[in-house]
């Protein structure tokens, strides 16, 4: 996967920084023992751990030599990204072919004062001149799953003015031209095979933490002369005996810093020479071997150490360890343990022990190659024994030789060690290693087992002592003896830690103690035998063991190369160290491994010392001058770094079997585990120990090379020690990752290795496994900070040409040479060390730590699916050349970081340089996907000095973050020389809605198989504020397929969210074997808790991103979901959609789980679906029943809504026919559910098949006795109700015999009554309402009038009476309200209001009754079809009935109007009508009389006929026409229309009228109206108020439409008929009277109109 680079820009002060933070910023070197974060950047000290592993006690290398307190460094689970921190990813160029992510953190001191960091430095990005071109690698090949992080002093990254010497694979030293910028490649083993391994290994991301210039200056000053001399000599490839281990270490440190590639190459050559070890070449990379080889001719050293490591070392060391080593190592182990205890660092102790071994093996130690071989041989024997023990023994063996060597040398101390080392040559080591055979190693290992047990106690004591002594040793380089004491104390403390771990790993500890004891007894013998045994074991055996160890763990891999190197110098040293470690324990072995590869360990220690302080540089020069001095320095370095070195070694050993033991010492649990692993892998452990030793040797060699390369001892060698301490923050117990362990074992050498070339895990095993996360352990290995970093050989530079992670580069934007460390005399104290870290993924399964080439763009890390959403591209830095700036006087600001200028996120405006001080990360929800892209920025890079300060701050922050990164180790990163760098600004966010993002996802899905194949990788994703503009240039997407999170990860759609979220958030995702682990950490909100107080944190895998989100309600049942789908299909309107998403969903989840899962409810849903299908137009009606049922259940919220849905088969649905009764009688068959707090749910499901109901209990949990009894009663009632329901159904179908006193009808009523009682009881037990299902029992709420008091009174009256109210009741209520509330309503107004209220309340009650009736009837009819739909005759009859319905409505309306009239008004109307009729009758009579008179006169027949016709006309005229209309005003102002009803036919007889009257009389006071009547009323007879008093218009009244067609006949009884004109729709205009012609013929008989038509309509 493409590696990401984190640039941490720690502005001096930001608004967010508290005084405490400012103090930490001002005094970063201030001792932070409680928190164990001394070396971390001040801003990052608050970052909580990432639970990468148990916190390791790391010796913090301070600028001052007095800094001895161990710092417990625990990787941060969550990385707190302070303001100004940007995270970027590099393309192919950024990452080495090994696939390591380059993470560079560089801090440069712009100010001479220590408070320079506090100054507000604009986070302007500086284009760092690096030859590297920043480009995202497009290769899809996934780098190794593990990311190795090694700390590298930023100054080392810089090119030193003098020519760097490059070691050719053939152990040739090739001087690099000054003009060429030096890239720091991972340290290659003395044999070139390591370089090959580098290609395999992912490039380690080097986190460089430059120490304050003052400390660096001191270290450089002390170590400078010696390191320069030795560097040049060693670089020259001279196999000069190192005057002292200190010199070797110094030289190695110098070489490591300036010539890290050379040391890497040397180590690689050594590895190649080691033969089978080339894969394990990291073992030969052990610092001690390179150191000796460097002091000795480096050329032979690569060859010899590699060969002896591969051959004689495995054999000889094992033999001596098996035989003489156990004997000698016992005393030496004790002595060594004591000096190791005295010596803070194991490496120091080892050197010291080697010096005593020099005493014991004075001749051998004098020829470093020979004596070390001899000494290491016995340790190898012990190592072999420990190798037999594998995990524990390997560690113990290494520690035992360290103890043996350290004890005797501790007594003799640096002088003897130096002498012995000088005496001991590669030849001696090789010879002894050759002499030592596997048998001897095994014997020694067996002896070591016994010794280990004894040594447990000694080691525990010594570890305690070591802890104290290590700190003491850190102080003075010149005091070898006190340092020896310190290492002893440290060893004691470490031994105690180891013993604790060893106690945990009983076998490993016993084995370790035994080898230590045997080694103590046979210190020299073991040393000799072990080399011999190792030689006997043969390089292949050691290689095999290293391979096995590599397979077993990174520690073994690392130990194997170390063993290979130790076969030459490393084996003797390892043996001597192992002999020393028998007493000191595995810590001493590790320290001895550091010491054993005297040069490597010295290099480590010198690197650590360089990292720690100039004092360590001085120690290294002293070691160069005196092996004893170098050992003292190593011891002091180890003491200073006892936490750093020993913890690192212990961490590495914990990772490796020996590293596990060291970690066990550091972390008793881890150490014990590591020791147990070592016990399991004793042979492998020997190989691992040898690897550790060889790695320290390789590291030492690399360190010496670097020291030689670093004649500028002033360079931040000591500041790198702080880096080491930072690197060692926590050793993780991952022996599985040999790469990580190897890289971690030697902070200096691994850094050099990482810088010089791909670091082999065996070389780094000495580093603590702090950063190594289980399979993705990260260790910050610190390369010696060589300010005078000579131009690293192009080879070295080439492997690490990949620019550091863009984010590191961005914030380090300081050009590599931008900040040259001023001469130590001139440099002000560095407030914060500047470090460059390169994160290189390390393969989890690979035993040899070979950084994989990061294929940035194309490679999709397995974690990418979750984390690769945000990707930032590094800026290409072309402004400065790494080679141009001399690194002697200035800290290297991080070769990787400087390689690329800081990358600015869109979160900060590109034009605002100060924006970097603000947090650039956003706290985005876990569902947020961010895809950064690069766009050229117009803003110039920030000034160099500010960039340097920013880099320092960023370096610290990034280092801490890297520590928190799982599966990442820190390795040095080389910067490719470039005259100028282009800044690229990433555009951060792509929304899922964007087409580009969709294409991106498709591409990622295509590459998903590649990710699955790749091992777990660590991805650092910067969650940036989403930019408003889409990304312009998008390189090949790195984001993995959106696996599970694909659906859950959602981009932040709104800019408001992005603006609101200003806190940085880091998403750390690790993918292991296809398992996605995603963690989103809000770094600001996480409290700063000391690691000791923090509980172990783990990253629980999030198998489904949805699970991480808040719990959601269970899905709908299948029936209910089908119902919702059907509703959407039937009605696709938005209203239905709102209903489905609203009430239907809310009510469902608010109802009890027992109810929604019950058979009754599911049956109800099924029936509703059937009805909706048959009557789709009534979909809302049918849904209402379901909603009412759910709503009724919502009343009681007894049960939680989140429910688990059992399979549908669990609650079989009976056919709908089994539910014949309405809801009032048959309650839904639902399982009883009892969910007590904290208890499981009890569900009782009932099957409806038989009369005997079966009850199914689901997840029955422990419930109280009371609940069980209640539950049992409920189930009993349900059974009874079910049986009664069946009986009711049978009785309804039975014939009724009215003569039978106990007829089926009576039985039916009794059963129904009993069913209702049972249902009410069930409701009581379940706490539900008894009447929730009866519409009639629901209260009404009248709100239609404008008077609230009246509304409430009327509603209360109706609900209380449970009867249809009367109009007068309504009117009385209104009158009462008017009187009480003084509404001031007139009588007519009250009548109108009461009338309206009466009608509306009546309709409400009527609708309720209809619904209830419909529910009851439909229960019987079920889903039957309407017979009228298939029978046309029935349909016609129904229509005719509807017509008659209109007539009935008219009658009702007529009498309703008449009811409104007073009796007086009615009487007056009648009188007036009579008078009118009388007048009319008189007129008619007069006409008739005139005609009669005419009859008396003679006339013709024609005239007679005319007269008869006239008389007939007069007689029928008044009745037929009814034209005489008079207007009369009633007292109440109503207009009465009096018309002669002559149109009534004979059909309207008294019988018909009687029938109508009888029909009307049948209505009771409650005014019940049938359903059909009320419906017709609502349609045909709209109600209107009476005519206003002012209206006086003539209205012609017509009785009915039919009147015109009927003969005009008055009613026989002359009875008034009051008809409603409105209902008849027969109003005519007054002018119609003109058209009617009155009959002129008078009628002798007056006709009285018998109908008065009163119209209330307005004309």
Swiss-Prot record:
It holds the Pfam family DAXX_hist_bd. Residues 506-520, 528-542, 600-625, 636-645, 658-698, 924-937 have a biased composition (Low complexity). It is found in: Cytoplasm, Cytosol; Nucleus; Chromosome. The keyword Coiled coil applies. Residues 438-469 form a coiled coil. It comes from Drosophila melanogaster (Fruit fly). It comes from the Eukaryota. One of its GO terms (biological process) is apoptotic process. Residues 1541-1555 have a biased composition (Acidic residues). CDD domains: DAXX_histone_binding. The keyword Coiled coil applies. Disruption phenotype: Reduces longevity and female fertility, but increases resistance to oxidative stress and UV irradiation-induced pupal lethality. Double knockouts for DJ-1beta and Daxx restore normal number of dopaminergic neurons, locomotor activity and sensitivity to oxidative stress and UV-induced damage. RNAi-mediated knockdown results in increased resistance to oxidative stress. Ubiquitously expressed with higher levels in the head (at protein level). Expressed in the germ line, with prominent expression in primary spermatocytes and meiotic spermatocytes (at protein level). In ovaries, expressed in nurse cells and in the germinal vesicle of the ovarian follicle at stage 10 (at protein level). GO terms for cellular component: chromosome; cytosol; nucleus. This is Daxx-like protein. Residues 1-25, 265-336, 506-542, 600-645, 658-713, 872-894, 924-952, 1023-1060, 1536-1555 are annotated as: Disordered. Residues 626-635, 699-711, 885-894 have a biased composition (Polar residues). The gene is Daxx. Keywords: Apoptosis, Chaperone, Chromosome, Coiled coil, Cytoplasm, Nucleus. Residues 870-1659 are annotated as: Necessary for interaction with His3.3A and His3.3B.
């Amino acid at each position: 996967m493409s590696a990401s680079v984190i640039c941490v820009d720690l502005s001096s002060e930001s608004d967010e920084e508290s005084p405490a933070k400012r103090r930490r910023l001002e005094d970063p070197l201030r001792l932070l023992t409680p928190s164990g974060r001394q070396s971390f950047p001040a801003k990052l000290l608050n970052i909580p751990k990432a639970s990468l592993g148990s916190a390791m006690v790391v010796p913090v290398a301070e600028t001052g030599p007095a800094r001895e307190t161990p710092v417990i460094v625990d990787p941060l689970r969550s990385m707190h990204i302070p303001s100004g921190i940007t995270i970027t990813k590099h393309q192919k160029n950024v990452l080495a072919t090994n696939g390591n992510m380059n993470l560079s953190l560089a801090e440069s001191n712009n100010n001479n004062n220590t408070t320079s960091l506090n100054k507000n430095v604009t986070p302007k990005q500086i284009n760092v001149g690096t030859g590297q071109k920043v480009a995202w690698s497009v290769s899809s090949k996934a780098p190794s799953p593990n990311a190795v992080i090694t700390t590298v002093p930023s100054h080392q990254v810089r090119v030193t003015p003098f020519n760097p010497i490059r070691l050719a694979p053939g152990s040739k030293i090739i001087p690099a031209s000054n003009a060429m910028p030096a890239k720091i490649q991972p340290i290659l083993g003395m044999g070139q095979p390591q370089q090959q391994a580098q290609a395999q290994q992912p490039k380690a991301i080097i986190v460089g933490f430059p120490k304050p210039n003052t400390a660096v200056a001191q270290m450089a000053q002390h170590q400078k002369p010696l390191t320069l001399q030795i560097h040049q000599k060693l670089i020259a490839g001279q196999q000069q005996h190192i005057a002292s281990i200190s010199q070797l270490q110094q030289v190695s440190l110098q070489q490591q810093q300036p010539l890290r590639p050379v040391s890497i190459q040397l180590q690689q050559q050594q590895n190649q020479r080691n033969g089978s070890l080339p894969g394990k070449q990291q073992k030969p990379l052990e610092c001690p071997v390179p150191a000796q080889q460097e002091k000795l001719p480096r050329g032979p050293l690569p060859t010899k150490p590699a060969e002896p490591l591969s051959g004689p070392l495995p054999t000889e060391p094992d033999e001596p360890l098996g035989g003489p080593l156990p004997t000698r190592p016992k005393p030496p182990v004790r002595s060594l343990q004591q000096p190791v205890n005295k010596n803070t660092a194991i490496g120091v102790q080892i050197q010291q022990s080697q010096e005593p071994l020099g005493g014991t093996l004075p001749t051998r130690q004098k020829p470093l190659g020979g004596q070390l071989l001899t000494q290491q041989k016995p340790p190898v024997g012990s190592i072999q024994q420990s190798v037999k023990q594998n995990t524990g023994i390997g560690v113990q063996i290494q520690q035992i030789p360290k103890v043996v060597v350290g004890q005797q040398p501790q007594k003799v101390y640096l002088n003897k060690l130096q002498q012995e080392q000088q005496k001991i040559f590669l030849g001696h080591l090789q010879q002894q290693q050759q002499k030592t055979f596997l048998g001897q190693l095994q014997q020694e290992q067996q002896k070591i087992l016994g010794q280990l047990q004894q040594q447990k106690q000694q080691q525990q004591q010594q570890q305690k002592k070591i802890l104290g002594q290590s700190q003491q040793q850190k102080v003075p380089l010149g005091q070898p003896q006190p340092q020896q004491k310190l290492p002893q104390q440290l060893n004691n403390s470490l031994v105690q830690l180891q013993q604790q771990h060893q106690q945990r790993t009983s076998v490993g500890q016993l084995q370790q103690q035994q080898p230590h004891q045997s080694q103590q007894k046979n210190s020299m013998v073991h040393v000799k035998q072990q080399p011999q045994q190792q030689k006997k074991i043969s390089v292949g055996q050691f290689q095999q063991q290293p391979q096995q160890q590599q397979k077993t763990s990174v520690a073994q891999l690392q130990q194997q190369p170390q063993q290979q190197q130790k076969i030459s110098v490393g084996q003797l040293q390892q043996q001597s160290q192992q002999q020393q470690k028998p007493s000191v324990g595995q810590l001493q072995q590790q320290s001895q491994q550091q010491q054993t590869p005297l040069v490597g360990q010295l290099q480590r220690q010198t690197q650590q010392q360089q990292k720690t302080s100039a004092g360590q540089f001085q120690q290294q020069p002293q070691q160069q001058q005196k092996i004893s001095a170098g050992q003292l320095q190593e011891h002091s370095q180890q003491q200073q770094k006892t936490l750093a070195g020993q913890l690192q070694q212990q961490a590495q050993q914990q990772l490796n079997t020996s590293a596990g033991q060291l970690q066990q010492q550091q972390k008793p649990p881890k150490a014990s585990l590591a020791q147990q692993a070592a016990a399991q892998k004793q042979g492998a452990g020997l190989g691992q120990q040898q690897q550790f030793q060889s790695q320290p040797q390789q590291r030492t060699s690399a360190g010496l090379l670097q020291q030689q390369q670093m004649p500028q001892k002033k360079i931040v060698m000591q500041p790198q020690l702080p880096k080491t301490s930072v690197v060692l923050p926590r050793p993780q117990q991952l022996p599985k990752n040999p790469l990580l362990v190897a890289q971690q074992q030697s902070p200096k050498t691994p850094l050099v290795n990482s810088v010089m070339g791909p670091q082999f895990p065996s070389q780094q095993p000495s580093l603590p496994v702090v950063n190594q996360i289980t399979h993705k352990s990260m260790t910050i290995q610190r390369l010696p900070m060589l300010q005078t970093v000579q131009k690293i050989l192009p080879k070295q530079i080439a492997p690490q040409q990949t620019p550091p992670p863009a984010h590191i580069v961005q914030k380090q934007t300081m050009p590599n040479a931008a900040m040259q460390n001023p001469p130590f005399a001139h440099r002000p104290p560095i407030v914060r060390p500047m470090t460059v870290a390169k994160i290189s993924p390390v393969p989890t399964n690979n035993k040899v730590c070979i950084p994989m080439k990061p294929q940035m763009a194309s490679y999709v890390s397995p974690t990418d699916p979750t984390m690769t959403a945000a990707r930032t591209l590094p800026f290409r830095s072309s402004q400065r050349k790494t080679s141009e700036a001399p690194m002697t006087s200035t800290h290297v600001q991080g070769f990787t970081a400087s390689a690329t200028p800081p990358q600015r996120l869109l979160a900060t405006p590109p034009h605002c340089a100060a924006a970097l001080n603000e947090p650039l990360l956003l706290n985005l929800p876990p569902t947020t996907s961010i895809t950064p892209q690069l766009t050229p920025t117009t803003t110039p890079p920030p000034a160099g000095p500010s960039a340097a300060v920013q880099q320092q701050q960023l370096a610290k922050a990034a280092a801490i973050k890297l520590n928190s990164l799982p599966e990442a180790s820190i390795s040095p990163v080389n910067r490719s020389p470039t005259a100028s760098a282009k800044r690229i600004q990433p555009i951060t966010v792509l929304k899922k809605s964007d087409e580009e993002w969709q294409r991106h996802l498709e591409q990622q899905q295509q590459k998903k198989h590649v990710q699955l194949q790749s091992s777990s990788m660590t991805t650092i994703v910067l969650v940036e504020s989403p930019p408003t503009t889409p990304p312009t240039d998008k390189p090949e997407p790195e984001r993995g397929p959106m696996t599970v999170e694909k659906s859950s990860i959602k981009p932040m759609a709104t800019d408001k969210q992005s603006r609101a979220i200003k806190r940085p958030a880091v998403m750390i995702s690790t993918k292991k074997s296809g398992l996605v682990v995603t963690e989103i950490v809000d770094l600001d909100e996480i409290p700063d808790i000391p690691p000791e107080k923090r509980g172990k944190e783990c990253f629980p895998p999030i198998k489904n991103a949805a699970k991480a989100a808040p719990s959601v309600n269970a899905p709908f049942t299948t029936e209910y979901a089908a119902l919702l789908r059907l509703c959407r299909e039937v009605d696709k309107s938005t209203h239905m959609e709102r209903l489905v998403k609203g009430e239907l969903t809310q009510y469902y989840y608010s109802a009890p789980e027992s109810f929604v899962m019950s058979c009754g409810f599911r049956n109800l849903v099924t029936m509703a679906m059937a009805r909706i299908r048959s009557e789709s137009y009534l979909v809302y009606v049918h849904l209402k029943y379901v909603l009412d049922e759910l709503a009724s259940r919502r009343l009681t919220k007894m049960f939680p809504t989140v429910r688990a849905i059992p399979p549908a088969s669990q609650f079989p649905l009976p056919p709908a026919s089994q539910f014949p009764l309405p809801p009032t009688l048959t309650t839904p068959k639902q399982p009883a559910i009892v969910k007590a707090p904290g208890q499981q749910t009890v569900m009782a499901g009932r099957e409806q098949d038989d009369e005997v109901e079966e009850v199914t209990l689901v997840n029955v949990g422990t419930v109280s006795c009371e609940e069980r009894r209640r539950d049992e009663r409920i189930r009993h009632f349900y059974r009874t109700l079910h049986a009664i329901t069946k009986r009711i159904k049978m009785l309804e179908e039975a014939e009724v015999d009215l003569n039978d006193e106990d007829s089926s009808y009576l039985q039916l009523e009794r059963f129904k009554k009993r069913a209702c009682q049972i249902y009410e009881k069930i409701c009581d037990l379940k706490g539900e309402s008894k009447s929730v299902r009866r519409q009639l029992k629901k209260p009404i709420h009248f709100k239609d009038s404008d008077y609230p008091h009246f509304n409430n009174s009327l509603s209360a009256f109706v609900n209380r009476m449970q009867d249809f109210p009367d109009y007068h009741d309504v009117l009385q209520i209104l009158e009462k309200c008017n009187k009480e509330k003084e509404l001031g309503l007139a009588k007519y107004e009250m009548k109108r209001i009461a009338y309206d209220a009466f009608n509306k309340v009546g309709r409400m009650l009527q609708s309720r009754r209809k619904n209830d009736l419909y529910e009851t009837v439909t229960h019987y009819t079920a889903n039957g079809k309407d017979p009228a739909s298939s029978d046309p005759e029935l349909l016609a009859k129904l229509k005719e009935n509807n017509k008659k319905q209109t007539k009935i409505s008219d009658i009702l309306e007529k009498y309703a109007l008449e009811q409104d009239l007073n009796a007086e008004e009615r009487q007056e109307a009648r009188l007036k009508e009579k008078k009118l009729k009388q007048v009319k009758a008189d007129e008619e009579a007069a006409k008739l009389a005139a005609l009669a008179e005419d009859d008396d006169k003679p006339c013709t027949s024609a005239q007679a006929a005319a007269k008869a016709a006239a008389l007939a006309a007069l007689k029928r005229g008044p009745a037929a026409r009814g034209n005489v209309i008079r207007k009369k005003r009633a007292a109440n102002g109503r207009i009465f229309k009096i018309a002669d009803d002559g149109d009534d036919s004979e059909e309207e007889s008294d019988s018909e009228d009687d029938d109508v009257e009888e029909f009307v009389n049948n209505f009771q006071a409650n005014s019940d109206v049938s359903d059909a009547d009320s419906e017709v009323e609502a349609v045909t007879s709209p109600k209107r108020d009476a005519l206003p008093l002012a209206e006086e218009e003539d209205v012609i009244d017509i009785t009915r439409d039919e009147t015109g067609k009927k003969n005009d006949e008055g009613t026989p009884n002359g009875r008034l008929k009051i008809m409603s004109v409105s209902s008849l729709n027969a109003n005519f205009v007054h002018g119609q009277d003109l058209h009617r012609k009155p009959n002129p013929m008078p009628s002798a008989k007056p006709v009285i109109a018998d109908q008065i038509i009163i119209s209330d309509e307005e004309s």
